[in-house]
Regions:
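Short, well-ordered coil/turn elements that cap or connect secondary structure elements
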Residues: 44-46, 81-83, 139-141, 209, ...
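A generic local structural motif
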Residues: 37, 49-54, 74-75, 131-132, ...
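Compositionally biased, charge-rich terminal segments
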Residues: 2-30, 87-114
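A residue-level signal for beta-strand positions that form part of recognition/binding surfaces
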Residues: 48, 62, 144, 240-242
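Non-catalytic C-terminal accessory region of glycerolipid acyltransferases
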Residues: 2-24, 30, 152, 156-294
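Hydrophobic alpha-helical segments of integral membrane proteins
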Residues: 34-42, 135-138, 172
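Helix-to-loop junction immediately C-terminal to a conserved catalytic motif
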Residues: 39-69
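Catalytic core of membrane glycerolipid acyltransferases/transacylases, capturing the structured
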Residues: 61-157
C-alpha cells in the first residue's frame, strides 16, 4: 500500500502534545536533540567540517532552504549544523523499513516457511511491525515527510499521479505557511559525478506560493565521502567538507511575473547562487557581484 496525501496530512510533521503522549507509540518518541547531538559528534570525529553563514538562517518563520546534492552526507551535515528543526522530503520506504523484512519472512523460500521457524512468524510480524512503526514515527518527529518519489511509475495512472503531486505541493505550501523550515534539493537527486545538475522549479514555486524567503546554500567536499571505499582508502578521514549558507532571497525580491514564469526566473537565479556558494565558500556568503536584482 502506497502513501497518499491524506496519510501524509495526518501523519506528517507531528509536534508531540500532552494528548498525543496518551498514545502508547508516542511514549517511544526520541527527542530530536539526542540523535542530532550523537550524529554531530560522529561527523566531527570523522570529517573536517566547516560551516559559514549560519546567521542567515532565520530564527523563526517559514522558509525554504536549498542546496546542491552530492552525497548522502549532505542531509546530515545540513540537519545537524543548523540549529533549527528542518523538514525533509524523504521516500516512503524509509518510514516503513518493516515491509522488506516482512516480505522476506512471508517468502515461501525463506527459512520461516517451515517449522520450527514458521511457528515464530506471528511474533515476528508483531515485533517487526511495532519496531518499524516506531522508527517511522521518530523520523516524522525529527522532521521527515514521507512521499512517493515516482507515483506515476507506481500507479501507471498519469492523472492520479498529477493529482498526487499537486496535493503534495499544496501540503508543502501549508508546511511553510505554518512556520516550518523546509529543505529541498532542486536537482531532484544526488549527482553521481559531483557536478551540479539543472534545477527543477519546485523549490521556487512553493516559496512563491507560500510567500516565504528562500535560502540558497552550497556544499563542497562531500562527494563520495560516505562510500566504503572512502573509508577503506582513508580519504574520508578528516576530509574537508564546507557548507556555505548564503543570503536569503525575501518574497519582496521575487520576480513579479506570473507564477510559472516567476518560478522559472527565480530557479535560474538560485542555480547561479548555489553554484557560486559551493565553488567559492571562502567568500563567506558575500554577494556575487554579477547577480542581478530580481
Amino acid at each position: 500500500m502506497f502513501l497518499n496525501v491524506e496519510t501524509v496530512n495526518h501523519q506528517g510533521i507531528n509536534k508531540v502534545t500532552e494528548n498525543q503522549t496518551e498514545n502508547l507509540e508516542d511514549l517511544f518518541l526520541i527527542p530530536r536533540e539526542i540523535p542530532k547531538f550523537l550524529l554531530k559528534q560522529i561527523l566531527e570525529l570523522v570529517y573536517d567540517i566547516e560551516i559559514s553563514g549560519s546567521h542567515f538562517i532565520p530564527k523563526t518563520g517559514g522558509a525554504v532552504i536549498i542546496s546542491n546534492h552530492t552525497d548522502y552526507l549532505d542531509v546530515p551535515v545540513q540537519g545537524v549544523f543548523i540549529d533549527r528543526k528542518i523538514v525533509y522530503l524523504a521516500k516512503y520506504e524509509l518510514f516503513h523499513p518493516q515491509e522488506d523484512i516482512l516480505a522476506y519472512v512471508e517468502n515461501p523460500k525463506s527459512p520461516f516457511s517451515k517449522p520450527p521457524l514458521s511457528l515464530m512468524k506471528p511474533m515476528i510480524r508483531l515485533l517487526v511491525n511495532r519496531m518499524g512503526d516506531s522508527f517511522g514515527k521518530n523520523l516524522q518527529h525529527w522532521g521527515g515527510m514521507p512521499i512517493i518519489r515516482n507515483h506515476y511509475g507506481e500507479s501507471m495512472d498519469k492523472k492520479a499521479a498529477m493529482g498526487y503531486y499537486n496535493q503534495l505541493e499544496d501540503y508543502m505550501v501549508d508546511i511553510l505557511k505554518s512556520g516550518e523550515l523546509l529543505s529541498i534539493y532542486p536537482e531532484g537527486t544526488r549527482s553521481e559525478t559531483g557536478v551540479m545538475g539543472p534545477f527543477k522549479a519546485l523549490a521556487a514555486k512553493v516559496a512563491i506560493r507560500a510567500g516565504v524567503p528562500i535560502i540558497p546554500t552550497g556544499i563542497s567536499g562531500a562527494h563520495n565521502m560516505s562510500k566504503p571505499e572512502a573509508f577503506l582508502s582513508g580519504a574520508a578521514f578528516k576530509a574537508k567538507i564546507v557548507y556555505n549558507i548564503g543570503q536569503p532571497i525575501p518574497p519582496e525580491d521575487f520576480p513579479k511575473s506570473p507564477e510559472k514564469k516567476a518560478a522559472k526566473e527565480l530557479t535560474e537565479e538560485l542555480e547561479k547562487r548555489v553554484y557560486y556558494l559551493k565553488e567559492h565558500y571562502e567568500r563567506r556568503g558575500k554577494p556575487r557581484k554579477f547577480i542581478t536584482k530580481l
